[in-house]
Design a protein with these regions (language model features):
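Extracellular/periplasmic helix-loop-helix junction of adjacent transmembrane segments
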Residues: 38-66, 107, 305-306
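Cytosolic juxtamembrane N-terminal segment immediately preceding the first transmembrane helix
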Residues: 1-30, 44, 75, 256
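Helix-loop-helix hairpins in multi-pass membrane proteins, especially solute transporters
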Residues: 70-205, 393, 415
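12-transmembrane solute porter fold
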Residues: 16-27, 36-37, 55-56, 231-241, ...
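Intrinsic disorder in cytosolic terminal tails and internal cytosolic loops
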Residues: 1-13, 465-489
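C-terminal membrane-cytosol helix-exit motif in multi-pass small-molecule transporters
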Residues: 176-195, 211-223, 241-256, 458-466
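Interfacial helix-cap and linker-helix signal at transmembrane-aqueous boundaries
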Residues: 42-43, 73-74, 106, 158-166, ...
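Central cavity-lining transmembrane alpha-helices of secondary-active solute carriers
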Residues: 57-72, 121-125, 312-325
Length: 489
């Protein structure tokens, strides 16, 4: 049958499109993992252990805001233009990070880098949702998700090796050639996809209130990690400010002609449940990405390189499970059981990680983190596909961006909360005359104990996910077909 999805699926140019999307995604995804193993050395060089989580937080905050904003702007100005812009911003931010002379500069420059990273994380999944039928999306979502696994494998290794050899600054400079390659591939392969019928109206009120609401909230969370360093009244003030901006944001979205985040989406139970599950699942995987290397170096005494190597099995398992989940969805058209399996497996992983102590062997740490990765990979395909299937093609852009948004929110909220748990645990443990290694061990144990609660909540919620069979065919944007066909000639 010569239907629309078959025309797209057989287009030879799709090979180059997927390659370009994967490299673009790689340049952002690599940065999430490469900095983890380098952070102890960065802190040692620039000073400021109290700022340990801030480079993560600033990056995640700016990328979280960028996902929604530029996901919507790509409806107006085209996916290709926004993708290229994202790479340029990311590369510039990387260069600035590499030249940082203190932690404050690094935190600020990571924020710039995060804007580009947010664009590059969201747009590839939107494009795949547009050019493939629901049944085929599983395979290609799995392929894109594997980029996170590959980058996560390469990231810790590169982060450790680069840090131990030429220095931590080069973990940022390495993004420059990758970014240039990504621009070249996307310029020559990706058509300028635009959503027809969208009014060229920018929701400035929504953008401003959205940015201020998130910034106030996340800044308050971050400052709350150390109540001794920051006045409580300032922290409370930030949360109040955030709440006011959030109310104004809701009001602005109700009035907007083209809202950046349409509120009616939340009336769909699949969208709401998938958003919550993305939030929880991302918090779980980030607990491993951040604190497994710290445990390996600080408790087990491993080098930056070896702490990166011990992360490889976890991230390979993430890649494998993402692809397997995508294949299962493509063949069966079902995804609910996979959502349940996601939290059963990740729950087992964090329970085991919570048992770690100074006597834990590197092989045990490797096994525990691998289980966490095996469950986490399922997230990248299941919840994006469930939401794309619950809405029309016209809404794929914003709904897909929203799923990436809630993943980033999960990480951005979890990172400072984990930091608060660590700081509180370290200060409490210091009062009972424990050694530094014992204090660090107990602090990391407490973090993983907290993630057990998140895994249990995710498991319960997964049972309420509505499952709708995926179709083999779907009406695909005629403009997309035309552009792909022209490029294939």
């Amino acid at each position: 049958m010569n239907n629309k999805s078959t025309i797209i699926k057989n287009d030879k140019n799709l090979v180059f499109i997927m390659a370009g999307l994967m490299v673009g995604l790689l340049v952002a995804a690599l940065d999430n993992s490469i900095i983890g193993t380098a952070m102890p050395r960065i802190i040692s060089n620039l000073q400021g252990m109290e700022y340990y989580v801030w480079p993560f937080t600033s990056y995640m905050l700016s990328s979280t805001i960028a996902i929604i904003l530029f996901g919507k702007l790509s409806d107006i100005y085209g996916r290709k233009n926004i993708l290229i812009l994202g790479i340029v911003i990311f590369v510039i931010g990387s260069i600035m990070c590499g030249f940082s002379t203190n932690m404050i500069e690094l935190i600020l420059f990571r924020g710039i880098q995060g804007i580009g990273g947010g664009i590059l994380i969201a747009l590839p999944f939107i494009v795949v949702g547009e050019i493939f039928s629901p049944r085929d999306r599983g395979k290609y979502m799995g392929i894109l998700a594997s980029v996170f696994g590959v980058s996560s494998v390469l990231g810790p290794i590169l982060g450790g090796i680069i840090t131990d050899t030429v220095g931590w600054r080069w973990i940022f400079f390495v993004n420059v050639p990758i970014g240039i390659i990504a621009i070249g591939m996307l310029m020559n392969s990706l058509p300028d996809l635009k959503l027809g019928g969208v009014k060229k109206v920018i929701d400035y009120s929504g953008i401003i209130t959205f940015t201020l609401a998130l910034s106030g909230f996340f800044l308050g969370l971050t400052l709350a990690q150390d109540l001794n360093a920051y006045p409580l009244v300032e922290i409370i003030g930030l949360f109040i400010f955030s709440a006011i901006m959030f109310v104004l944001f809701i009001w602005a979205e109700k009035k907007a002609v083209e809202p950046i985040l349409p509120l009616y989406l939340f009336k769909n139970s699949t969208f709401t449940i998938s958003s919550i599950e993305n939030f929880l699942a991302t918090a779980l995987i980030f607990s491993g990405i951040i604190y497994v290397p710290l445990f390996a170096q600080g408790v087990l005494g491993m080098s930056a390189t070896n702490s990166g190597l011990i992360m490889i099995p976890m991230l390979i398992s993430l890649t494998i499970s993402a692809n397997i989940a995508g294949q299962i969805i493509s063949r069966t058209g079902k995804y609910k059981k996979l959502a349940i399996a996601e939290f059963l497996i990740t729950g087992a992983g964090v329970i085991l990680l919570a048992t770690m102590n100074a006597d834990t062997s590197p092989y045990e740490l490797l096994a525990y983190s691998t289980i966490l990765g095996l469950g986490s990979g399922i997230m990248y395909t299941v919840f994006t596909i469930s939401v794309q299937n619950a809405f029309s093609n016209r809404e794929i852009g914003i709904t897909t961006a929203a799923m990436q948004f809630f993943r980033n929110v999960g990480a951005t909220v979890a990172i400072p909360i984990f930091g608060y748990i660590m700081n509180y645990s370290m200060s409490s443990s210091a009062a009972v005359n424990l050694s530094q290694k014992e204090i660090l061990t107990l602090s990391i144990q407490n973090i993983f104990m907290a993630t057990i609660i998140l895994a249990f909540a995710g498991l319960i919620i997964a049972f309420f996910l509505k499952e709708t069979s995926l179709n083999d065919d779907e009406q695909i944007n005629e403009e997309i077909i035309g552009e792909l066909s022209d490029k294939a000639k």
